[in-house]
C-alpha cells in the first residue's frame, strides 16, 4: 500500500474519526491514550483512528510516548 493511500474506512469509523478530531481540537494535543480515555476505546481502535488521522495529514508521526504533532489548524478546518 502506498504511503498516502488510506485503508478503507467504514461509516462507523468515519463517525469516530470526526469525534476524535473534535477532541483533539478541544485539547490541542493528540495521543492514542487521550482518545482511549475520552471515548472509552480500546487501544487497537484508538490506534487505528490515530493512524487514519496520520494518513490524512492531520497528525504527525508517533514519537514514542510524546503526543502527536497536529499538522493542520483544526479551528480553521471546522
Where are these regions (language model features)?
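C-terminal intrinsically disordered, low-complexity extensions immediately downstream
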Residues: 1-78
Amino acid at each position: 500500500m502506498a504511503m498516502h493511500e488510506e485503508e478503507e474506512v467504514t461509516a462507523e469509523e468515519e463517525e469516530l474519526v470526526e469525534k476524535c478530531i473534535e477532541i483533539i481540537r478541544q485539547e490541542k494535543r493528540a495521543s492514542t491514550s487521550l482518545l482511549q480515555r475520552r471515548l472509552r476505546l480500546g487501544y487497537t481502535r484508538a490506534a487505528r483512528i490515530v493512524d487514519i488521522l496520520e494518513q490524512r495529514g492531520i497528525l504527525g508521526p508517533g514519537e514514542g510516548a510524546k503526543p502527536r504533532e497536529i499538522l493542520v489548524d483544526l479551528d480553521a478546518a471546522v
